[in-house]
Amino acid sequence: AVALPAGVGMESLPPDALSPSAAPPPVVVSVLSTPKLHQVLAEGGPRVGATTTVPAATPPSEPRALDGKRRGKPWWEELFNDDYLRTTGSVTEREIAAEATFIEESLGVAKGATVLDLACGTGRHAIELAARGYQVIGFDLSLAMLARASDDAQERHQKLNFVQGDMREMTFEDAFDGVYCWQTSFGFFEEEKNAAVVGNVHRALKKGGQFLLEVVNRDYVAHDVPSLVWFEGDGCICMDEVHLDFITSRLRVKRTMMMDDGRSKEIEYSVRVYSLHELGKLLNDAGFRVAEVSGRIQTPGVFFGGEAPSIIILAEKR
């Protein structure tokens, strides 16, 4: 899943709480052809298009935390739908294969092993791993994502199960040899619920099972916000206003979508972003032993602190 979504957590400090003498940082405005927030941040900026720094007197307005009562449902239930699929861009088969190889080698399980793709989204990794001989279950909350995943699996003549559910309520027990959660699909919830998800993963794994988690590195993205990111999707133009709440470490995004059929949509979402020591403690407290940390799939086992776009952490169930 790409993963991402919206406004849960504490509000940022109001603008009048800041020193009036402190000039705001320049706003980075990007024009790109890829839409995923995690790609923009984890790759150090847009891969395609032009990037310019505009000296701005006032940074973009801070996206507010979503009011769940006003909205009626949390942002992760609103974001991941058919319109979202229009913004996800394309990923090459070569990129999918490379990511699947990294996942496969990190988990280190035998062919035929049972593997859970947690927050599988459209299932591209699950389908690729199934084709390589693993028994894969894709788990996601979004029916729109799972429908696409099922269609793609049928096109590739792969048989695997996709399960609709909420990771906070996952009840698997000693069921999997390996679990992976990719593309910053973790951190949507409040602190206690995020910790509960890690506990659910621990319970779902067999003893000695491996958990591979990939999220954007807080220490990396902190240098690049606030920012405005424009990108083109399938029949839509999108703008993301991105801020980091430095108190709660939640990355807050206000996304505006303008469709070619004249519709426009606006949604706010936020994701808890972590530094390595925070993730390590979270995993250790849940009963895991951290085995390896990487910053990119191209450099397994190598992590360069704030210079690493991602935190890819492999942990073993104790």
Question: Where are the language model's segments positioned?
Answer:
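C-terminal lobe and adjacent flexible extensions of AdoMet/dcAdoMet transferase-like proteins
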Residues: 276-318
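A short acidic, Gly/Pro-enriched loop at the edge of an enzyme's catalytic core
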Residues: 171-178
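SAM-dependent methyltransferase
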Residues: 212-281
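A short glycine-rich, Lys/Arg-flanked "PGG" loop and its adjoining helix->strand segment in the class I
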Residues: 195-207
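Class I SAM-dependent methyltransferase SAM/SAH-binding core
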Residues: 126-169
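Conserved class I S-adenosyl-L-methionine
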Residues: 55, 60-110, 112-119
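Low-complexity, Pro/Ser/Thr/Gly/Ala-rich intrinsically disordered linkers and tails that serve as
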Residues: 1-66
